[in-house]
Amino acid sequence: MDDKLLLDTFIKQVIEQENYTELDRNYLYNRILNLVGEGVEKLTTTKNEIIDLKNELVEYAVQHGKVGETLNEQDCLGAELMNFITPLPSKVNQDFWQTYQQKSPEEAIQNFYDLSKRNDYIKTKAIAKNIYFPVETSYGQLEITINLSKPEKDPKQIALAKKMKASGYPLCQLCMENEGYQGRINYPARANHRIIRFDLDDKQWGFQYSPYAYFNEHCIFLDTIHEPMEITKQTFNNLLGIIEQFPGYFVGSNADLPIVGGSILTHEHYQGGRHTFAMEKAPIETELKFAGYEDIQAGIVKWPMSVIRLRGNSKEDLVDLADKILKTWRGYSDEEVSVLAESNGEKHHTITPIARKRDGQLELDLVLRDNQTSEQYPDGIYHPHPDVQHIKKENIGLIEVMGLAILPPRLKGELQEVEKYLLGQENKMEEYHQVWADDIKQKYSDISQENVGTIIQQELGRVFARVLEDAGVYKHDETGRMAFKRFVEEVGIVD
């Protein structure tokens, strides 16, 4: 492969993206020279992909002291370089809505997704590092990921971040002010970040992709105002409004309470994408008819968590019934099964809602959540219990509720040590995996080098199913089923 001049090759590709013309070549040359350092003009490359070219320019800048050695500093420069191939926010929005109206919503969405990958806002190469596998369980095929895409902070970055003065700008990583933000040691680079504006019930919202996607076309819908997460009747209206505007996507919201909520409760937002989760495939276990809403198909879903599914053609009726279920749940207690609406003035009940279109009808899944703690379960009664926390101890948020486990990076190395232990080899297995590993040893009599990896995957899937069962309010036994029935009777069902 012929060597080409790195800077010239990068500039050629920038011009090909049509934000600049040949007339801008000298301007681009000098701007990039300033960012990366003189001398780069002599550097050659064999690479062709623009992201690879960007990485080589960043590497040169690090070697010549134009940018620091921490990953965040390098990301800031990388995003600034990729900003050259990213149109201005006004142009991105203009193109999106022109395509949406004149061609199709699907094409507009696809173009924006392609741009977000092309300009390295979606970190496709980092995402490819994630470990992923499906596991068959009694609830269907659950999905397991070990999340290796997000770079862990290096010691230099941590030390520098401690010295930095606190900044209140942007207020959080979901604020609109992130669009084009340079980034800093303790805050991600967003120079190449773009947000599509859209109207939702007379309010402006934003649509963007997730840089470290957990599934196909993982996107975020965000309130343009920085206000806390809140599940209300308006939430159901918003979710159903979004799936009508963004065909092919599901959308859901994290719960609005600690323990059962997501990692960001301070800014109203939803997550969506083009992916079919195990929960969506799960069948109705018990059919229901709610009084006054006989046109809505409803039922309890066969799922480890407690899910009521509603399906119908009338958005208004679905929103009204979902709101009735939410309001009933917020005030509902059943001490026989440790279900408590509030204690000491603290509310415990909320819902994790998910909306999708299926066979032309609107569908809502309402997952009942309870964030109580107890002496026995200080992390949460309906949260992964201590015996499974060696695998998963973090909150069970929207994505996991639907059947996709997001497991911590530490497990990659730790599970290799568990494999060695199961094979009787010398190992450094963490003590907290001991009971689990011994159970696996007892369960399988023929563990070998050939099958040990598959066995670990199957057992991880079983642990994740247990994690979801722990998070489920009504358990899959006679007591749980009867208690769930008492709740839906409280909402008002027709026998």
UniProtKB/Swiss-Prot annotation:
Q: Where is the protein situated, by its record's location annotation?
A: Cytoplasm
Identify the metabolic or biological route this protein is part of: Carbohydrate metabolism; galactose metabolism
Catalytically driven reaction(s): alpha-D-galactose 1-phosphate + UDP-alpha-D-glucose = alpha-D-glucose 1-phosphate + UDP-alpha-D-galactose
Broad EC category: transferase
Where does this protein chiefly localize? cytoplasm
EC number of the protein: 2.7.7.12
Keyword Transferase appears in the UniProt entry: yes
Q: Name one GO molecular function term.
A: UDP-glucose:hexose-1-phosphate uridylyltransferase activity
NCBIfam families in UniProt: galT_2, PRK05270.1-2, PRK05270.1-5, PRK05270.2-2
Q: What is this protein called?
A: Galactose-1-phosphate uridylyltransferase
Lineage, broadest ranks:
Bacteria, Bacillati, Bacillota, Bacilli, Lactobacillales
